[in-house]
């Protein structure tokens, strides 16, 4: 579900935390991708002209495999090394959100059943997209394809976005890639959005720098997590009527969710906001503060040469894809992976910022400048 309104708040208070660029600007980077979110996007977006998902002759859905295969190749061709991270067992607190999603799918099915025979393709597609969920079989199929492509994947013990953030924090990858803004609650140095969107959509990639985001909001890590819970996350409902502006104001005024809850409960006559009964906000906070993840140091990532014979057997003979296209894709993949990361200059050197004539100098800089002048004067005296 993500965090409602967080994008808006960061853009307003921390515009410097945002960057937009093209895929090629990630040249030489390793990126951890939220696979479950990625597959969900492919099942929705990769469709035939009549709005139906891609299927093979046996009627099996193949949209997710097409998406993984071609988008991964596109990244590798741009000298990006992706690693896909799959969800593990969801936290107990997420049960309520999962139940809501199930109810929405059931409602969408009712709408489809009630559509008349002459219903438009767009109406049918709209409700069909609401039925989409990533099955266990589809996850397994994607893993098999990645293995044959030589692309590493990680099975997270719990939430995929938390594991992506852990890999980024641990230096295994440059950034976490997910559409879910709650990924920022797990402190990835960088969050990438729209990375796996279709090229035809011409959507730039968003990069959000975590440290700059919370600095602009003038919040601690704990306050940022409290803000996200107040805005609404997957783990618990929010306080009815509290939107982004009010949530930000409450955190700034009271300092923490604990103080906000206490104030609202002790002053029911002074506010229209009611705290939900038995609201598990503290449990939600702990899931963000101490997520269940594999330590980055224990995760080994290896990119290998694709198994062409295996790809032909699986994608062509089993899944009905065009052999010419799979061979062509495999060749591009092989070429891209063989080239490897040719290197970014900032990967080999520590970039030292230059001081401009207009930039203020700190105390240490002023001392250094004074000492440099003294040293230069001494050299002139010696030369004389």
Curated annotation (Swiss-Prot):
The gene is FEN1. This is Flap endonuclease 1. It comes from Lodderomyces elongisporus (strain ATCC 11503 / CBS 2605 / JCM 1781 / NBRC 1676 / NRRL YB-4239). It is found in: Nucleus, Nucleolus; Nucleus, Nucleoplasm; Mitochondrion. DNA binds at residues 47, 71, 159, 232, 234. Belongs to the XPG/RAD2 endonuclease family. FEN1 subfamily. Structure-specific nuclease with 5'-flap endonuclease and 5'-3' exonuclease activities involved in DNA replication and repair. During DNA replication, cleaves the 5'-overhanging flap structure that is generated by displacement synthesis when DNA polymerase encounters the 5'-end of a downstream Okazaki fragment. It enters the flap from the 5'-end and then tracks to cleave the flap base, leaving a nick for ligation. Also involved in the long patch base excision repair (LP-BER) pathway, by cleaving within the apurinic/apyrimidinic (AP) site-terminated flap. Keywords: DNA damage, DNA repair, DNA replication, Endonuclease, Exonuclease, Hydrolase, Magnesium, Metal-binding, Mitochondrion, Nuclease, Nucleus, Phosphoprotein. Its cofactor is Mg(2+). GO terms for molecular function: 5'-3' exonuclease activity; 5'-flap endonuclease activity; DNA binding; magnesium ion binding. Residues 341-349 are annotated as: Interaction with PCNA. Its EC number is 3.1.-.-. Phosphorylated. Phosphorylation upon DNA damage induces relocalization to the nuclear plasma. InterPro entries: 5-3_exonuclease_C_sf, Flap_endonuc, HhH2, PIN-like_dom_sf, XPG-I_dom, XPG/Rad2, XPG_CS, XPG_DNA_repair_N. Binds 2 magnesium ions per subunit. They probably participate in the reaction catalyzed by the enzyme. May bind an additional third magnesium ion after substrate binding. GO terms for cellular component: mitochondrion; nucleolus; nucleoplasm. Residues 362-375 have a biased composition (Basic and acidic residues). HAMAP family: Fen. PROSITE patterns: XPG_1, XPG_2. Residues 123-254 are annotated as: I-domain. Pfam families: XPG_I, XPG_N. GO terms for biological process: base-excision repair; DNA replication, removal of RNA primer. It comes from the Eukaryota. Interacts with PCNA. Three molecules of FEN1 bind to one PCNA trimer with each molecule binding to one PCNA monomer. PCNA stimulates the nuclease activity without altering cleavage specificity. CDD domains: H3TH_FEN1-Euk, PIN_FEN1. Mg(2+) 2 binds at residues 180, 182, 234. Mg(2+) 1 binds at residues 34, 87, 159, 161.
């Amino acid at each position: 579900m993500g965090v409602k309104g967080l994008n808006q708040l960061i853009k307003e208070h921390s515009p410097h935390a945002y960057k937009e660029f093209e895929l090629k600007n990630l040249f030489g980077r390793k990126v951890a991708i939220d696979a479950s979110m990625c597959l969900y996007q492919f099942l929705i977006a990769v469709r035939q002209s009549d709005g139906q998902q891609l299927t093979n002759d046996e009627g099996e859905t193949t949209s997710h495999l097409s998406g993984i295969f071609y988008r991964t190749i596109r990244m590798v061709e741009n000298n990006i090394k992706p690693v896909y991270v799959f969800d593990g067992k969801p936290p107990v607190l997420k049960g309520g959100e999962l139940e809501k999603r199930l109810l929405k799918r059931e409602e969408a099915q009712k709408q489809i059943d009630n559509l008349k025979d002459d219903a438009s393709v767009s109406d049918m597609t709209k409700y069909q997209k609401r039925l989409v969920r990533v099955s266990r079989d589809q996850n397994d199929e994607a893993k098999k394809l990645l293995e044959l492509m030589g692309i590493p994947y990680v099975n997270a013990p719990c939430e995929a976005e938390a594991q992506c953030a852990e890999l980024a924090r641990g230096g295994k990858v440059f950034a976490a890639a997910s559409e879910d803004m709650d990924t920022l609650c797990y402190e990835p140095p960088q969050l990438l959005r729209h990375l796996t969107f279709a090229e035809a959509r011409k959507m730039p990639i968003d990069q959000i720098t975590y440290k700059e985001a919370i600095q602009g909001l003038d919040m601690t890590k704990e306050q940022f997590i409290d803000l996200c819970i107040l805005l609404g996350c997957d783990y618990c409902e929010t306080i009815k009527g509290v939107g982004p502006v009010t949530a930000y104001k409450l955190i700034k005024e009271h300092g923490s969710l604990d103080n906000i809850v206490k104030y609202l409960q002790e002053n029911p006559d002074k506010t229209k906001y009611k705290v939900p009964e038995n609201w598990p906000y503290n449990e939600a906070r702990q899931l963000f503060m101490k997520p269940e993840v594999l330590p980055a140091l224990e995760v080994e990532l290896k990119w290998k040469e694709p198994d062409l014979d295996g790809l032909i057997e699986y994608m062509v003979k089993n899944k009905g894809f065009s052999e010419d296209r799979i061979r062509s894709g495999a060749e591009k993949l092989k070429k891209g992976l063989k080239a490897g990361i040719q290197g970014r200059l900032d990967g080999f050197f520590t970039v030292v910022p230059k001081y401009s004539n207009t930039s203020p100098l700190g105390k240490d800089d002023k001392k250094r400048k004074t000492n440099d002048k003294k040293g230069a004067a001494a050299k002139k005296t010696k030369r004389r």
